[in-house]
Amino acid sequence: MKRDTDISQEVALIWNTANDVLRDIFQRTEYPDIIYPMVLIRRIEGVMIAKTEQLKEELESQLSKVDKKTQEQILNGKILQEIKFNNTSGKTLAIIADEGESSIKNNFIAYLNGYTDNIKMGYVFEELVRKFSEANNAEAGEHYTPREVIDLMTHMLNMDEKAIKDGQLVTIYDPACGSGGMLSAAKEFVEEKINPNAKVVLYGQEVNDKTWAVAQADLLLKGETAYITKGDTLYEDGAAGEQFDFMLSNPPYGKSWKKIQKKVLANSNGRFDVGQPRSSDGQLLFTLHMISKMKPAELGGSAIAIVHNGSPLFSGDAGSGESEIRRYILENDWLETIVALPTELFYNTGIATYIWLIRNNKPKHRKGKIQLINAVDFWKPMKRSLGNKRRRIDETQINEIIQIHKTFDTGPYSKIFELEDFAFRKVFLDLEETDENGNPITEEKEVTVAQNKLNDTLLIKTADEKKRLAELKDKKGKEGEFTFNLNPESELATKHKTADASITIRKALDGNKLGLKASINVPKIVKDTEYIPWKDDKEAFLKKEVEKKWQITKEEKGYEIPFTRHFYVYQPLRQAIEVVYEIGLLEKENTLLMNELGINL
């Protein structure tokens, strides 16, 4: 990140102070709880004192004409008007320290208040957040996304294509904003790369109380126009009814939402109607939430960059919540690009991660198309690992990825697909079992036959069959078994998928009542499913892939994005002679080493 202000001395001073003063008294993970508030408080005091002295000079003639109480009222009013906060306790940190420990608590409580605009201290605060996050790497992934990932996401949003003009309002939103790093970086990008005169307003939400407070402090110290709400985005939508120009986020992945599922669905307000992912992983809910905040395309539309692990690409079968969410995004032609990032890039996980770029204002040449970018090899090793983070993406590599995205062409790291390339049919089949000679295998099945449907169910042609049918219906006749041919067009034959079968009916008499029990031999059916690419002819596919006689009973459409499959490169196995030769060399080397040790084999 580029900065015009050198903050290294201030950061070093605070960092070293924390190590010198707090060590052995507090755990390292507790340092931020003490340092963050003190940095904020000290900055507030500095701004307040400087503004008070400035106003005293500017209002000297006016103040000299009134009493002390009126002077304080005038000064306090002016300070509130210009810097939006003031401290009327009449104390400073130095005064509180001088007054001794006995009264420090009460004096300190009375003293606390307010935030202000100072870009240098804002950067100091952000840098401290980063350093403490890295030092406490087990916690870092909860609220801190590596800067290079944020930079890549902001570049890929293609904000410059919006031609942001002077004074134009630009809204940026992060529903899982953590310490606010993504929001700050996005604003910097607009001001440094696009238009410094744009009016950028930041919106965010964070569920963790401490992290929310850090985000508030960081953004307020920088003087950002920001609205950060506290609460769970999934059931406490802090931006209800709002729409934004740009959205970016790194929500928790692989995190269960089972405990809050009822509250989420009760407060969805239509956000999650298209489908819900399994309760063990709620990350796709954040995607749907952000989509619900998109501006209509006719009003300029919106762009979203969100980080996911691999699960949202393929988890869930056809008809599942995950598949239906993918279907919703793809069939609306909102998915523009997915970038596979290097592993070991984040602080608390080494797994594969992906940036999804979603927009409802895709340029004409991208409509109906999806770009997959394989950037897993775009990394440099870190000099010192930070938890699971052992790799970084440098500025040159970020620019290479951005260029691949802009070029929008097929190559070693990029592939272009149509929407239906990711669709498939899940076909449910009934397969008829056959013996080794290919003859159908049948099994006896109990069925119900109503007396008033006997004529329709049975195939009666001969006089003998008519006679036996009459005997079967006769309530005064003999009990016994009667065998007939089954009418192939009957409801019973259709239901049990047997057109050429006999039916055995057992007649029983109970007084004046006629009881009928029947059984038929039906083909032995095995249930099966086949997954067929949507663009393939299903009949041709089944004829080629399924040997047994089949009947389609049901179909479902699903979507998955098998990212790694599309970039798989076959590595041929080595020749056996090469392997044998190397084994021989190793055996000779082993023998020499053993001989040197005086061991004869």
Each language-model region and where it sits:
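Non-catalytic, mostly N-terminal accessory regions of nucleic-acid modification and defense proteins
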Residues: 1-161, 227-238, 340-343, 367-374, ...
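Short, contiguous acidic/charged loop-to-helix segments that flank catalytic cores in large enzymes
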Residues: 25, 258-281, 310-320, 342-347, ...
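Conserved Class I SAM-dependent methyltransferase catalytic core
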Residues: 30-43, 153, 216, 276-358
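Active-site catalytic pocket residues across diverse enzymes, especially alpha/beta-hydrolases
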Residues: 48, 190-194, 294
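Conserved S-adenosyl-L-methionine
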Residues: 139-249, 253-265, 284, 308-310, ...
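Feature representing long, continuous alpha-helical segments
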Residues: 184, 213, 249-251, 284-288, ...
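Flexible, glycine-/basic-rich loop-and-beta segments that form/coincide
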Residues: 347-446
